[in-house]
Amino acid sequence: ALVRLATKYFQSHAPATLADFVWWSGLPVKECRIGMEQISSALTVKMINGTEYFLHESNRYGKMQKDSITLLPPYDELLIGYKDRSAVLSKEHERKAYNTFGIFYPVVLHEHRIAGNWSRKELSVTFFENDKPDAACLEKAKKQYEKFVNTNR
């Protein structure tokens, strides 16, 4: 069961640290280490800001196209599935992604980083910084969301 849990976690969370896995699973550090050791042949280590992150061989992280944009819903696993969110979210923008009461907002993922917020009603996007991604990529992300919503009605 431990091997399966570690495999599923690292397949769906990338990059992730040992601390992230411990926090998400609720298991002791020792058990999480054992699970990670048992799947070590499927994990690659990546250093990000001096911290050791692990990527499962099946994960798409790093394979996204340049200037890729994804509109993520509130409470997306990208934010709630990690103890330390610094790999995807700058400290200065944390309160734009979630508040101190645990309310998470819809966010824009741009090239592996949370780069803004978006509104479902108007399908409008606000970026945290002045630089904006390619307009065609943003339109593609909006169309993907619209297709998803229309498919699931």
Where are these regions (language model features)?
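Long, charged, low-complexity, helical-prone intrinsically disordered regions
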Residues: 1-153
